[in-house]
């Protein structure tokens, strides 16, 4: 076992695929807010945040930047209403599209009291890359600490609507349970520091 020292608050958590070192402080976030518009960033304030909703893009191989730009383009195409507060890319990069105090069009009736995270994935399985997974654990743990939540408040889009999203975590319940455990361990570790 190789231990990695990370500056800031860190926790070593693992899942069946890899060892994950999580820094529970704020991750690096590339803030690229969408233009305020009726189709992807309505500019409405959220209520008290009571949960974090995990999604997958359902667009294999697409990048965080491509997904962010798609959301922003909806103001011109009027194709649908869709967005997310954050997008985690294939290399673990994080783009913020909508402030956490504003509604994102991602989780139906839970849009007003949750923060949504879209995740890129390389193929049709919906399984995230190691880099995406690590960043997702870190971002989710940081948001939980920020809003006074626990891993029990982290849900899938599936848990709101029954949609097969995020696909891999819906089809592999054990991987979902392990992800939430990883988030819980990171939160716990951050509280000890």
Task: Locate each region found by the language model.
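Bacterial N-terminal signal peptides
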Residues: 1-8
């Amino acid at each position: 076992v190789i231990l990695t020292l990370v500056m800031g608050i860190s926790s070593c958590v693992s899942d069946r695929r890899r060892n994950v070192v999580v820094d529970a402080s704020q991750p690096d976030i590339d803030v690229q807010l969408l233009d305020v518009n009726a189709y992807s960033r309505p500019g409405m304030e959220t209520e008290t945040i009571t949960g974090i909703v995990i999604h997958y893009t359902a667009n294999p191989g697409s990048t965080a930047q491509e997904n962010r730009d798609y959301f922003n383009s909806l103001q011109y195409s009027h194709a649908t209403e869709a967005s997310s507060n954050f997008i985690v890319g294939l290399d673990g990069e994080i783009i913020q599209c909508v402030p956490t105090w504003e509604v994102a069009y991602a989780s139906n009736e839970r849009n007003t009291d949750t923060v949504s995270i879209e995740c890129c994935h390389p193929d049709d399985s919906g399984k995230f890359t190691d880099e995406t997974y690590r960043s997702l654990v870190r971002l989710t743990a940081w948001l939980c600490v920020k809003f006074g939540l626990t891993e029990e408040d982290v849900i899938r889009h599936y848990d709101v609507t029954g949609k097969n999203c995020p696909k891999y975590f819906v089809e592999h319940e054990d991987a979902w349970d392990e992800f939430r455990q990883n988030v819980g361990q990171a939160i716990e570790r951050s509280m000890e520091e």
